[in-house]
Amino acid sequence: MRYVDEYRAPEQVMQLVEHLRQRARLLPHTADRPLRIMEVCGGHTHAIFKFGLDQLLPENIEFIHGPGCPVCVLPMGRIDACIDIASRPGVIFCTFGDAMRVPGKNGSLLQAKSRGADVRIVYSPMDALKLAQQNPEREVVFFGLGFETTMPATALTLCQARERGVANFYFFCQHITLLPTLRSLLDQPDNGIDAFLAPGHVSMVIGTDAYGFIASDYHRPLVVAGFEPLDLLQGAVMLVEQTIARHSDVENQYRRVVPDEGNPLAQSAIAEVFCLSGDSEWRGLGVINDSGVHLTAAYQRFDAEAHFRPAPQRVSDDPRARCGEVLTGRCKPHQCPLFGKTCNPQSAFGALMVSSEGACAAWYQYRSQEIEA
C-alpha cells in the first residue's frame, strides 16, 4: 500500500535504527539520564508500542508520553454534565465512540445509555446535524471534543446549522488547544523534557510556525513527525542531530502531509466559530490557562450548556491514580498501582485506559505480557 508499506519496511527500519544508535553515541546523555523525547500525540504513543520502537532505541534515548490525547484529559465533571443533559426527556445526545466509556463520578455515557438515555455514537458532527433535521421534535446535542485537529469539522457543521436554520441542534464544547498545554508543561521546573515529537494531525491545521516559542523561549528542539515507524525514527534522528549540534529549532519531518503554514481554510473556519481563549480544566493536569475554546457571539445560540444549564460539576481525581504523572512523562503506565488491576480496558478507572490512543491502553495491549513475565 503506497505511503504505508514503504514507511514500515523492516530493512529500512533497522538501517535507520543502526544510524540512530551510531549518532546517539555522540550525545552527552547516558542510560542513567537519557535524552527524553516527549511524543505529544496519542497516535504516536500507540504507534511506538505497536511497532516496538521504544525497544529499538539506544539506552541513552527514551520516549516519554505527553498529554496529546483529548479523550484522556476529559475531566470527570464534564462527563457528569453530559450525562445530566443526555438523561433529560426529548434529548438525543451524540458523540464519538471513544467518549462513551470515559468514567465520570456518575458513571459513563455508555452506562447512561443503559439506564435509558438516548445516547448515540456518530462518526462526524454532520451526522448529528442530520439527526437534528430528521427529528425536529427532539433536541439533538453533539458533544464535540478534541484539539485543533477536529475543530474545523465542528466549525463547518455549526456554519451549516446556522445557514439551514436548524433550531433544535446544540453543541457541548470540549475542544481544547494544545500549545498552552506544552507551555504549561515547560513552565514546570521539574518537567524533564529534552525534546518534542509534535503531532502530525494537529500540525496539519496549525502549521509548524506555531511551535516556534518552544525553540525560542524554552530552547527545546521540536520535530513534527508522521505516524509510521520510519517517520518516528527519522524524527528521533533529527532531534538527536539538533541536540548534538546544541540547536533548538522547529523542523518538519512530515512534509508529505503538513505544510509549514498549516491549513488556512481550516484556520478560517475555526476563527469564525470559536474563541480560543479562557482557562480549561484537564483531567490529571488541573486548570491550564488559555487552553479553553468557546463559541463566538454569532454561534452562541448553539451552546448546549447555556441552553440546558447543567449543574456545575467539579470532581477531584482519585489520588491513587497516576494519570497526571503519565500525561506529563513523569512515570510509565505500568508504574501506576491501579494499572491492569482496578484499571483495565474492560473496567477503566482512568481515561488513559479508555481511548485507543491512551498511553495506558497502549501499554496494556502491547506490553502486559512482558510486565507479567
Segments and roles (model prediction):
Residues 1-137, 151, 155, 159-164, ...:
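Metallocofactor- and cofactor-centric catalytic cores in central/energy metabolism, strongly enriched
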Residues 6, 72, 143, 147, ...:
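Hydrophobic alpha-helical scaffolding
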Residues 92, 139-141, 195:
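Structural motif
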Residues 143, 147-210:
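Phosphate/pyrophosphate-binding betaalpha-module
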Residues 172, 190-259:
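A conserved active-site cap/scaffold subdomain adjacent to cofactor or substrate pockets
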Residues 234-325:
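Internal helical hairpin/lid segments
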